[in-house]
Amino acid sequence: MSKTEITAEPGIPMIIITREFDAPRELVFRAHTDPDLLVQWLGPRDLALTVDQYEVRNGGAWHYVNTDAEGNTYGFHGVFHGDPSPDAIVQTFEFEGAPGHVCLQSTTLAGRGGKTLMRSVSSFQSVEDRDAMVASGMERGVHDSGERLAELLARLQAS
């Protein structure tokens, strides 16, 4: 598996994202938890990411903003739950353009002989919230993020 797979089963308030990366899980974990690396891969290619806060610890808050070419901003925030590790990065996720529609994301990283299988499960409060996320065009950002992360991991391993 080298492409990002997105699964959103009808009637279930959940989105599952999986992708295998050609990099060790510790490096994939670092890319998920180091804000200097996060800005290099998270989100659509045509948006700039600014990380305002990223406290990777139990109860730690995070906040980042995507900015498009016209200067429009799209803010997101949440809180980490438990101590983030390659076994589980658990956090809430809320788009500031639709307050009150919080989802819980759990990302696991499984090492596979120098490669890493990433599995991210987003659980929504309702099927309607999940459907609104799917309808928002999130697939483009998810696919771009997967490609950009693979490119970043290749650069980090080459240096």
What do these predicted regions represent?
Residues 1-48:
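Hydrophobic ligand-binding cavity/cleft-lining segments
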Residues 12-18, 49, 61, 75, ...:
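Intrinsic-disorder/low-complexity, polar/charged segments enriched in Ser/Thr/Lys/Arg/Asp/Glu/Gln
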Residues 16, 36-73:
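Short beta-edge strand/loop motif at the mouth of beta-sheet-based domains
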Residues 125-159:
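A conserved amphipathic terminal alpha-helix motif
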Residues 62-67, 90-96:
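Short beta-strand segments that buttress and anchor functional surface loops
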